[in-house]
Amino acid sequence: MIIEVVLERLDVKHDVFSKIQTHRKKGSIVTSNTSTIPREQLVKGMSESFAKDFMITHFFNPPRYLRLLEIVSGSEVSSDKVQIVSDFCDINLGKEVVVCNDTPGFIGNRIGTYWTLVGMVEAFKSNLTVEEADAIMSRPIGAPKTGIFGLADVVGIDLIPHVTNSMISNLAKSDPYCVAYLEQEELGISQLFSDMVDAGYTGRKGKGGFYRLNSSSGSKVKESRNLKNGNYSISIKPKNLQSVRAAKRGLR
């Protein structure tokens, strides 16, 4: 089984697939770790034999902690091969496998990217700090404690534009995701991502992201980024947020 995990760009993936197609053993299964690109586009231009052996296995990030894995196959892929991949991911890798339709973002990112996008838009409009936004958009709604900005740091801020472009290129302009994206553009959030990446702030794998650890004083101090001016200051956990208190009590 060959798993492709390169950049979330269709042209880059096609280049890798062409090389795999030349060297792979006949009948070997090939999968892509794409998080948003439809399978139909991934196999376009590839041989019929390649398409019969090709599926999507979307590992959620970070894969060493998150159990969820999405599988997307096609009508030309035999059910036996789908079962082989599903069993391997379940038994050998310990994943919780969900078989999805071939739609933009599949299930997880069709919901997750929209939720994150809208959350960031509302944070900007409400003048929230990244800590306030993450406190609200995390445990109180049953989401991971990273929230939205912390999650962006984990995933990689440099990856976000590629994921976004993949989604908007495969959805109707009237889709709520595309509508929210236009609002993000107007608020300057897309430009913020670009500026951060250019400066090396790609998240945890870089100099930091919306959060960073500053060790200039000799000890590591957690700092957060001001969404308006881009400056960093000591990260302060918000207290007495009404929505957080309500979540702890339970919605009754």
Q: What residues fall within each predicted segment?
A:
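N-terminal glycine-rich phosphate-binding loop for ADP-containing cofactors
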Residues: 1-252
